[in-house]
Amino acid sequence: RNFLDLNPTGGVIYFESESAISKSMIEERGIDSNRMIMMPVATIEEFRTQACRILDKYLKEPKEERVPMLFVLDSLGMLSTTKEMEDVANDKQVRDMTKSQLIKGAFRVLTLKLGQAQVPMIVTNHTYDVIGSYVPAKEMGGGTGLKYAASTIIYLSKSKERDSKKEVVGNIIKCEAKKSRLTVEGSKVATRLFFDERGLDKYYGL
């Protein structure tokens, strides 16, 4: 929403793998659905192909005619692979060992194209607990491909926010900069997100 507000002529390409968002949900949050294209994707290969095609077409346009554009992938962790889907269809009980390499290859290509087109991209992903770690730690799923390609990696955690009647009215979201080329790595901040029309509390913690 902030990107669209700051760029009145801009648009968002939303790659969606979780089937968790709809046009009505977008409009309820005050986002212009006409400036947001939802693209369902099921596999890493499908996402890579669709994203590259859009960027190639975008790069062919004269630079002065390009409108601001934002890519969003929600989420990387839910993307399958062509091999995994074929194995499921054929009832093969084997682990897909190609996923990490496919992710690394996809973002190796996309990072270059995104940079050339000056198109920012937001990727959501899952984390898991590191087993055997001396101190409790979490790691991002999908291998090292996205970790090395990303300019900024933010880990999010949440706790419930209650009012004076002990009713849950929102979440306190804690953000930790695991990687950043723009700010101090390891820095932590917290913000508050209300479930009602108040939304994100921009004054929380000040």
What residues fall within each predicted segment?
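Phosphate-binding/switch region of NTP-binding enzymes
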Residues: 96-205
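Walker A/P-loop NTP-binding motif
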Residues: 1-6
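Conserved inter-motif catalytic segment of the P-loop NTP-binding fold
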Residues: 7-105
